[in-house]
Amino acid sequence: MNNKRYDRFYPGKVWLDTEGKRIQAHGGSIIYTNGKYYLYGENKEKTLPGSEVWHWGVRLYSSDDLYNWTDEGIIFKPSHDEKSPVHFSQYLDRPHIIFNEKTGKYVMWIKVMKKEKMCDQIIVVAVADNITDEFKMISAKTILGLSSGDFDLTVDAETKRAYIYFDKVHDYKTNCGDYTRQHTHIVCAPLNDDYTDVLGTYTEHLETRGGTYGREAPSFFERNGKKYLFTSATTGYFPNPTECAVCDTYDGEWKNIGTVHINDTENTSFRSQISSVFKHPFKKDLYIAVADRWLVNLPDNFPDNFYDILRSRDDPDRVQLMPNEEIDKIMECNKPCNRNTSIADYVYLPIEFDGDKPVIKWHGEWKIEDYE
């Protein structure tokens, strides 16, 4: 048993549960329900370099204070059937859970990239009566005829209509004849009344040229009537700058308002990627950016402008800022055979606001109790 009781957040440091084990809730989200906080995410405990294991299901933790987490077990189990879309070798990422007041069900959506062809990305939907129950898969399919990438879910507090935001993914054939993924839009689509499928309509937003200019990993939140989306660039597990877009409606004209990690000299979102935003239910204006530090072994001399260096290689209209061999050397830790995501850390930081613009500053440690 871990006798240490946390009384604050330590972003980027090893975070243990109440049994003294690393917390395994990557690509995670927090939900407050039934008088408790619940943290859930990808269980990466078996995802070691050289293994065929991408995920070991979705793990859930409970807490009374957001600092100390008790393991509630695996609520969505991996399959051992190689034909299953949720076989442990399939690229299952970023689960999101919403509660349906009408049906009384908790509904989990999960993105799955098929390992045979990563451009083929589907959505798995599973349901449970209680958040601590095992979620049962009810569908696994392409939605809206699109290959859907990272996503987020939200429920309108008044109408109870739910929406999904996801990055639209395309096949792209390179000059070498290989196929790669291009992320060109963020899609918004309303869900049906029981939150188990889309209605069939959608809108496209925040168009990009793709490549490292593409945006993924949308994280949605609301404040003072405005809707916000944090998005990440498409550099794999390699960290890059988070951008923010704002809109007055769910499917209106989204406007990019720039990067948010304002004192981040490396331009890497403090070496992390945001997976969700949690509004504290008992604080006036406390929003928490929930993020993973996927690569814990980046070099100390990591170039401050490395994202621009990557983009210069991706853009034929720009002068390349670093030779390919030097770029490849830095990117070595991002190769699948070298990634050990079982030891990925977490970077949970408070979101501040400059007027209506969200900003995130670095805190080596911080406490919820310091906020009204």
Predicted regions and their residues:
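Carbohydrate-active catalytic/glycan-binding domains of CAZyme proteins
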Residues: 1-372
